[in-house]
Amino acid sequence: MELKKLMEHISIIPDYRQAWKVEHKLSDILLLTICAVISGAEGWEDIEDFGETHPDFLKQYGDFENGIPVHDTIARVVSCICPAKFHESFINWMLDYHSSDDKDVIAIDGKIHRHSYDKSRRKGAIHVISAFSTMHSLVIGQIKTDKKSNEITAIPELLNMLDIKGKIIKTDAMGCQKDIAEKIQKQGGDYLFAVKGNQGRLNKAFEEKFPLKELNNPKHDSYAISEKSHGREETRLHIVCDVPDELIDFTFE
């Protein structure tokens, strides 16, 4: 990835510090922080250490006229930036590498950030919904939610950030919702949803249409793959067919 483009995008982030007190440029601090975290840094001191060991690399893209900032300065400055602007600039950087012309498959999924729960402050764990480009192996969109149940309302917001024309959107069963399907189609995309118990009638209809004997001897075009995952052998069977007549008028719950 070109870090020069990153520098262009983070330049939109406003610096609220008093100009006469500024010793390190905001863009330099953010460049250092992003590169360090991508490289595995887990704390402010790690970020400072990364800067001290990679000064020549960082100076290819930033000024760093006064050297590498100390960890206290990095923490203070980063805590004061506008989260929304930082999010916008970072996602735009990712989108630079995501062509609107390719036939990509975008996987949308929610994850809970490890160690983000703070019991002493009664602060729940951070839940994030991400859009992952499988073609480019990039996160091209991300939204924070309060809890997993909010995924249904967060997914449409995430879709607003993306150009999904001609692309396939994949979600788990939580995203199997009529409104989400309609939104994807309106934006020119297609979708592949998982159907489970949260769509009771629809799930039952699929089970009746594709009983176990059909899965063991598919009548339609099919493809099976086997892989090891989570310590077990998994076989995935893909059956491709036109929508059966009995499901054409079947709606989401």
Curated annotation (Swiss-Prot):
Source organism superkingdom: Bacteria
UniProt-listed Pfam families: DDE_Tnp_1, DDE_Tnp_1_assoc
Gene Ontology molecular functions: DNA binding; transposase activity
GO BP annotations listed: DNA transposition
UniProt similarity note: Belongs to the transposase 11 family.
Name of the protein in question: H repeat-associated putative transposase YbfD
Organism, as annotated: Escherichia coli (strain K12)
